[in-house]
Structures are given as C-alpha cells and as structure tokens.
Swiss-Prot record:
<dbReference type="InterPro" id="IPR008886">
    <property type="entry name" value="UPF0227/Esterase_YqiA"/>
</dbReference>
<dbReference type="InterPro" id="IPR029058">
    <property type="entry name" value="AB_hydrolase_fold"/>
</dbReference>
<dbReference type="Pfam" id="PF05728">
    <property type="entry name" value="UPF0227"/>
</dbReference>
<comment type="similarity">
    <text>Belongs to the UPF0227 family.</text>
</comment>
<protein>
    <recommendedName>
        <fullName>UPF0227 protein Sbal195_2522</fullName>
    </recommendedName>
</protein>
<dbReference type="InterPro" id="IPR022987">
    <property type="entry name" value="UPF0227"/>
</dbReference>
Amino acid sequence: MIFYLHGFDATSPGNHEKMRQLQFIDPDVRLVSYSTLHPKHDMQHLLKEVAKQMKHSDDPAPLMVGVGLGAYWAERIGFLNGLKSVLINPNLHPEDNMQGKIDRPEEYADIANKCVSQFREKNTHKAMCIFSVNDEMFDNQQLASELSAYYSIDWDDVQPHKFPQLAAHLPKIKAFKLA
C-alpha cells in the first residue's frame, strides 16, 4: 500500500497521474487528502486517516509518498506511524514560504516545536528524497544539505517542482519500499 499526499495544489490533475504511476510499484495507492490551509487540523486529520487506512490493509510495509507540502507531511506522519516515506521536492519550511497563502503558517512552527525532538535522527534511513535540479520553487541544494545526514538523496535533471513524471525513479522507490 502506498499513501499519496498531494502538495499545496490539491486539485492539480497531476496528482491522479502520479498515483497512476505509483501503481506500477503497488496497485494499492491511496490518496490521503487534506485542506492545506489549516496545519494543526491537517495533522490531526492525516494521523487519523492513515491509522484508519492501515487497519484495512495487510501490507507489512506501507509507504508514504509526498510532493512539496505533501512531503512535509509524509515525513512527519510516516515517522509517527513507523512508515518509510519518499519525499519529493519537500517543502521543509512552510512556516516561512506559505506566508500569504494560508491563514496561519505559524502553526507549522508550532507543530515542529511539539514534534518529537530530533525526530530526523530517530527516523534516519526511513525516508528517501528526490530533488529536482531545476525546482522553480525552492533552493533544493540547501534543502538536500538539511536532509543528507539522515536520508538518501536522489537528483532529477528534468522534472520541475510538481514532478509530473516519476517513471525514472519508480525502480528506486520500489526497492526502498521492499528493503
């Protein structure tokens, strides 16, 4: 089973396409949608929804996959549920870069402060990251340097921020899920 968490643009048609591509790894791909506008509510909703979905699966190794803001949540919700996660062009600092886009971006900082201290050290090797060299939204070199001590980093020379084509990375994602 793969949980797919969309980015800030929840209605993008690319979400369906990415889910279809992920079905080459596992036919059971589930969209876990969230508002993107209310971080504290989103966190509670995502925790409950993932726990509920896991009860209805016999997969011994479910995987979280998130793009952009979805990767922010995939890392945290995956950690809290003991799941591996794939972070694609993760938005690591929504408290800074979501100003003007959501009502209370400061809630992300509050979530970070209330999360398990040094959770990345406790989550080492349980996530892999895929970054676009040509990401038009974030400085992925900087973000990769924040995560490289904890997770493996793969680079893509072609895809933009929303990462519409996962095909080149599906074998690595599958191997990571099954390892």
